[in-house]
Amino acid sequence: MASVCDICSKGPGFGNRISHSHRRTRRRWNPNIQTVRTRVGGTPKRLNVCTSCIKAGKVDRF
């Protein structure tokens, strides 16, 4: 599944995973992306949307 929101273009965030001995390895935080059916220009379409856009009401689900 895509890890980018089609509405706000939110993508993954990057940082370090730090162990107990303080060694660092790279990791990523993926946004919570859901597949939502909505109407775009009157035609039904599936979009990959983050949950913050769904909560904000930026997409109409049906």
UniProtKB/Swiss-Prot annotation:
InterPro entries given in the database record: Bacterial_rp_bL28, Ribosomal_bL28, Ribosomal_bL28/bL31-like_sf, Ribosomal_bL28_bact-type, Ribosomal_bL28_sf
Any one GO MF annotation of this record: structural constituent of ribosome
Gene Ontology, cellular component aspect: ribonucleoprotein complex; ribosome
GO aspect biological process, one term: translation
Key words of the record: Ribonucleoprotein, Ribosomal protein
Family as reported in the entry's similarity comment: Belongs to the bacterial ribosomal protein bL28 family.
Protein name in the entry: Large ribosomal subunit protein bL28
Source organism of this protein record: Thermobifida fusca (strain YX)
